């Protein structure tokens, strides 16, 4: 309990709150730069908005990563609104937390390059697994209901890109899982390349 209280106090320090706000704002802006992928429907777009989330989680802990991810979603909703009845934004937050929290938990116990790489690999794996589960049982069914779309029509959007996508399970395995694997891997790669320099700035100048 005492350790948890100290960690909460540190997280809520003025410096960390400022950094989380800055990283959340940067992450929200990065959501504007989206790249479509050829193997998934158009509402799956690749971006690098989770790089600040992952950096913040490494620097300040897993809870900070979740807060930064929430800030980016709030900024996106305020500036752009939603075209997915909030489902896309919820999915984005879940993805970010699934990647950043396991990575930060592993890195926190032994802060080394090897630990960071192991953490990011674990984070990507969790991101893929959580993405498969939530899309199968929560996100895609909710999306279909929100837009009064038969699930077959949603699956058909995947079939148009890949004839092997002929069921919800195939949609998740051949579109959702590769998308999360690609995004998580690219975000982790960029984070690995820039984290050391950014962390020095956080410690020495902010």
Predicted regions located by residue number:
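Loop-helix junctions at membrane interfaces
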Residues: 1-206
């Amino acid at each position: 309990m005492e350790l948890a209280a100290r960690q909460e106090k540190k997280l809520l320090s003025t410096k960390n709150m400022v950094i989380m706000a800055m990283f959340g704002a940067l992450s929200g802006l990065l959501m504007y730069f989206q790249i479509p992928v050829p193997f998934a429907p158009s509402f799956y777009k690749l971006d690098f908005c989770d790089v600040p989330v992952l950096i913040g989680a490494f620097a300040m802990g897993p809870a900070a990563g979740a807060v930064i991810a929430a800030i980016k979603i709030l900024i996106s909703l305020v500036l752009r609104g939603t075209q997915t009845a909030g489902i896309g934004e919820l999915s984005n937050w879940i993805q970010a937390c699934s990647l950043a929290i396991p990575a930060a938990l592993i890195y926190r116990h032994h802060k080394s390059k090897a630990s960071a790489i192991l953490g990011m690999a674990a984070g990507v794996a969790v991101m893929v697994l959580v993405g498969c589960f939530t899309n199968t049982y929560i996100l895609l069914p909710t999306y279909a209901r929100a837009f009064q779309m038969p699930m077959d029509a949603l699956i058909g959007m995947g079939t148009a890109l890949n004839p092997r996508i002929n069921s919800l399970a195939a949609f998740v395995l051949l579109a959702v899982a590769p998308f999360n694997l690609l995004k998580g891997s690219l975000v982790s790669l960029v984070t690995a390349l820039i984290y050391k320099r950014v962390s020095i700035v956080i410690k020495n100048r902010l």
